[in-house]
Amino acid sequence: MADDIIKVNQWGKVTKLNAGGGLIMPFVQELFLLECEIAGTGFVKNMEEKAKALTAGSVVSLVREPDNKYDDLAIRIDNSDGEKLGYVPRKQNEVLARLLDGGKMLYGKVAEVEFAEYSSWVTITTKIYMKDL
């Protein structure tokens, strides 16, 4: 590590050059974008069971649904087994949809899972991140 050289390239991207081999290794950054409550959990079958399997820090996937009949900017949120948990709320999905459409890697981490005391209602709060190279 002491032989590494830190450089800024012509696009302003910081890279690390290994003086021994000259290999370019980007700094991988996890960029926090927003926090939201997953929408539509009340319409997901077996939601309570799926929610019980989640803990703070559980990673969730963001999947674009450009052909969604209710919202052409829809972003589905799936658990680690690929099962639907719900959606990014419509009022927060436009920029995220554009990033996903542009090939950016977005994902979420569960921040909190709350179960209603007298019903089967579940509130899942997730933090959305972009992995930037």
Q: Can you say where each PLM-predicted feature lies in the sequence?
A:
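Conserved active-site motif detector
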Residues: M1-L133
